[in-house]
């Protein structure tokens, strides 16, 4: 046993210090990024936000809308091959290039992944997703996927430390997914005592990934557009959003009525709700590590996306970054004791 004394920070612990700017308008800010990925060699450009691969966020309906904003969707792994086939035949190449195909790490998952990828050469992204990216089995699956799919962009996670980021990149990942426990409906930290404050994880993991020519995605912990800006400021190449995109018309979630008001259920993918739906319940040997909440219906997701993109542009103007690419270099974080004035409640 040992204790690390260094202070680790989450998004709520900091603000971004404003700096002199020559920008005249938020409209002058370019949010698109361009990446050439280490292993696949594929070059991609777009707005580096990703809808999370949760079954009430990473949906086909979400992918159709977000592609119009040049934003990615990690489509959840619970669609059948037949459902994928129907989706692929109903959308164009431009939508498919904004889609990540999510997979677990079982043999059945591997077979299904190959069947889905065979549907269209425009499906370029793979998202290998497990709660604990530190397992040897996970790394072996990643190596196998890289061998079979040399031209695909592989995003793999989740991890929170630099040495494991390096391990995954050297094993075939182009992008490493960073975050253990920060999600709005994740209870891993309270059930297990395991985790890492998200901003510090992003800063440390980005440093490790960039040293090897890889990228990271900050997954979890964003509750408002300012948190997204902080993630990019901390060095994230992509930011994945779950709760911020939940309960919209495109989420395909279950709608319930509470006190005469229509609500949508939103739950973590390790919650009892998710396991009851997809694997027949919580196994005897494990605990659920997610919770279920009911959220007011929020209408079309496009309004929320515009709000997030607007917040990002505004953050860039406050520090003089004409492009999102410049935000990290222009960011100085200051530690704070409070984030906002809540005399009239929390901001939306």
UniProtKB/Swiss-Prot annotation:
InterPro entries, alphabetized: Aldolase_TIM, GMP_reductase, GMPR, IMP_DH/GMP_Rdtase_CS, IMP_DH_GMPRt
Cited function: Catalyzes the irreversible NADPH-dependent deamination of GMP to IMP. It functions in the conversion of nucleobase, nucleoside and nucleotide derivatives of G to A nucleotides, and in maintaining the intracellular balance of A and G nucleotides.
Assembly, per entry: Homotetramer.
CDD domains referenced in this protein's UniProt entry, alphabetically: IMPDH
Binding site for NADP(+): 108-131, 216-239
Keyword 4Fe-4S: no
One Pfam family of this chain: IMPDH
Tagged with keyword DNA repair: no
Family: Belongs to the IMPDH/GMPR family. GuaC type 1 subfamily.
Single Gene Ontology MF annotation: metal ion binding
Catalysis performed (reactions): IMP + NH4(+) + NADP(+) = GMP + NADPH + 2 H(+)
The organism's place on the tree of life at top rank: Bacteria
Record-listed E.C. numbers: 1.7.1.7
GO biological process terms held by the UniProt record: purine nucleotide metabolic process
Primary enzyme class: oxidoreductase
SMART domains in the cross-refs: IMPDH (SM01240)
Signal sequence segment: none
Keywords: Metal-binding, NADP, Oxidoreductase, Potassium
Residues at which K(+) binds: 181, 183
Protein name: GMP reductase
Species in which this protein is naturally found: Edwardsiella ictaluri (strain 93-146)
Active site: 186
Cross-referenced SUPFAM superfamilies: Inosine monophosphate dehydrogenase (IMPDH)
Cellular component annotations (GO), alphabetically ordered: cytosol; GMP reductase complex
